[in-house]
A protein has these predicted regions:
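A short, N-terminal "cap"/entry segment at the start of jelly-roll beta-barrel domains
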Residues: 2-46, 79, 94-95, 113, ...
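Short acidic-glycine-tyrosine-enriched beta hairpin
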Residues: 37-41, 52-53, 82-99
């Protein structure tokens, strides 16, 4: 009886630790600036950084924006639907147009974090990211 109880408690502890680790391993966006563009009715610019822990990838998504990416540190793999994936290093850039589906967005390294700067021109008040579907 005690052995079964201990095994169950151990399994629950492992499951909780795994779930906490999985939650911690996500990209993290930090907004830097959001500014209306008065010369472009209904448009705004947003600038943010996105951090990718080692080995982390985001699910396919859309931005519905002109999206410019600049790699600050580490290496990332980016791909829009219909194009080949590209691996980018610090100082390199990537562009998505408003109709693109961002099929791949991941840290190229399983051991080191990566960080990018993202500059978007989008419809004012619209979410920066939404699921691809």
């Amino acid at each position: 009886m005690n052995g079964t109880l201990i095994r169950h408690a151990l399994l629950v502890a492992i499951a909780v630790a795994w779930a906490a680790g999985a939650q911690a391993q996500q990209t993290r966006a930090t907004p830097i600036l959001s500014k209306d563009l008065p010369d472009f009715a209904g448009k705004e610019v947003t600038i943010s950084t996105v951090e990718y822990p080692a080995g982390v990838a985001s699910a396919p998504h859309r931005h519905d924006a002109h999206t410019f990416v600049y790699v600050l540190e580490g290496s990332v793999v980016m791909q829009v639907t219909g194009a080949e994936p590209v691996t980018l290093s610090p100082g390199q850039t990537f562009y998505e147009n408003p109709t693109d589906v961002h099929a791949t967005s991941k840290n190229a390294s399983a051991t080191a974090p990566a960080r990018i700067l993202v500059f978007m021109i989008k419809d004012k008040g619209m979410r920066a990211t939404r699921p691809a579907n």
